[in-house]
Each structure stands twice: as structure tokens, then as C-alpha cells.
Design a protein with these regions (language model features):
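Glycine-rich P-loop/Walker A and Walker A-like loops and their local beta1-loop-alpha1 context
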Residues: 1-11
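Conserved catalytic-core segment of NTP-binding enzymes
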Residues: 68, 72-75, 81, 85-174
């Protein structure tokens, strides 16, 4: 699903850096002790990748925040229009709660259409809302194209966000995990990505430090 998400940003003309800091991400390159720029791998003209498991904790400050890691990322990738940070909600809350890089972080929840995953998605949304004061969320839902549960799940999360957290689920998109990378991007995914880009000042891709925390809420990864 992350591949399709990155493709959608590329289609909007944005150069994306995917920072993979989840528990199952590859270990960071040994050169990371010298600086992050040397560890960023260019996958295509529109997409770069940083294996970042355990890297945020190397940048923890005296208050327990890993916000300095975001600053290091921005300095290491000055040409990136979008930074996608793929990590657990607990890690993202430490990273974004006290950061000053952007006033427009946009958390995107990634879930599938099973009850345990939906419960986990709500728990992550609650954690980010309370600890990092994030209030506008997006949802990327992995499910078959005609899943009878997909729309109901989005409605349920939207209702819970509004009624219990004072937050908003501003958009959602369904991605078929079995689809081929060459298949056309779903229109809903295009709309979701355009909404993320609109949260930053100015029009169109620009060097405005759009950092989108991506909380991977699939149970196997948490």
C-alpha cells in the first residue's frame, strides 16, 4: 500500500522521501552515524527511501522527544517535497508532539478491513490526537475492491474521531493489496493525496517541509 501511496504523490509532481522507521524496517546503514544524507537511497526520480529502524531514538532530546530526527531528515533531503514517516503511533507521537518543522503534519492511518485492525487504527488515532494534538486524519484501507465492510469502517472511524476526539477523518481511500503496480491509481487515493498536499502553505509541490506521519496499523507490524 505504501508503494501505491508514493506513486500517487509522484503523479502530483511531488518528490517523496519515505522514512521507514517501523519495527520491521531494515536496519539503518552503518553510515548513519556520519549523517542521514549518505543513507538515503534513490529509487526513482520521484522517490527516495531511508531505512530508519531505531534511528529516531538516536536523536532523542532531554525531554524524551525525537523531534530532532525530523530536523535531521529535512536537512538531509532538501529536495524532498513530501516526507512520509512510516512508524508506530507511539513513535510518531514522540516525534511530532514537540516538532517545529511544520504546522501542517497530516497523519495517515493504514489499516485493513478486519475488526482488530480497525480497533488498532482508532487507538493510534487517539494516541496521536492526545499526545501530538493532531486533529485531521486520512485513512488508507487495504481491502478488496468490493469489500462490504470498507465504507462502514471509514464511517465508524469518522464518527469516533468526531464524537470522542474532536478530530476529523478528512478523507479515505481503498487500495486493493492484490493489485498490480501498473494498474491505474484509484480516484479516491488521488483525492486523498491532493488533500494532503493542500494542507501545506502555497500551491503545488514546494520546499515547505510537508511531513506526513504514516502510522502502519496492520496488527502484524505492531
Amino acid at each position: 500500500m505504501l508503494e501505491r501511496l508514493c506513486s500517487a504523490f509522484a503523479d502530483e509532481g511531488a518528490k517523496t522521501l519515505l522514512v521507514d522507521a517501523c519495527e520491521r524496517a531494515p536496519a539503518p546503514d552503518e553510515l548513519s552515524v556520519m549523517g542521514l544524507a549518505e543513507c538515503i537511497e534513490t529509487l526513482s526520480p520521484e522517490l527516495s527511501y531511508l531505512a530508519a529502524r531505531t534511528l529516531p531514538l538516536r536523536h532523542v532530546d532531554a525531554q524524551g522527544s525525537t523531534a530532532p530526527f525530523l530536523q535531521a531528515i529535512v536537512e538531509a533531503a532538501p529536495r524532498a517535497d513530501v516526507v512520509l514517516v512510516h512508524a508506530a503511533a507511539s513513535e510518531l507521537s514522540r516525534m511530532f508532539a514537540r516538532q517545529t518543522i511544520t504546522s501542517y503534519p497530516r497523519p495517515l492511518l493504514i489499516a485493513d478491513d478486519h475488526p482488530a485492525s480497525v480497533t488498532h487504527a482508532y487507538a493510534a488515532m487517539k494516541l496521536l490526537a492526545l499526545r501530538a494534538r493532531m486533529s485531521v486524519f486520512g485513512l488508507v484501507l487495504g481491502a478488496a475492491p468490493h469489500s462490504p465492510r470498507a465504507e462502514r469502517i471509514a464511517e465508524q472511524l469518522s464518527s469516533c474521531a468526531d464524537n470522542f476526539l474532536g478530530a476529523v477523518l478528512d478523507g479515505w481511500a481503498l487500495i486493493d493489496p492484490a493489485c498490480r503496480p501498473t494498474e491505474p491509481l484509484p480516484p479516491a487515493l488521488r483525492r486523498l493525496v491532493r488533500g494532503v498536499l493542500r494542507t501545506a502553505p502555497g500551491a503545488g509541490p514546494s520546499r515547505s517541509a510537508r511531513a506526513a506521519p504514516i502510522g502502519d496499523l496492520l496488527p502484524a507490524l505492531n
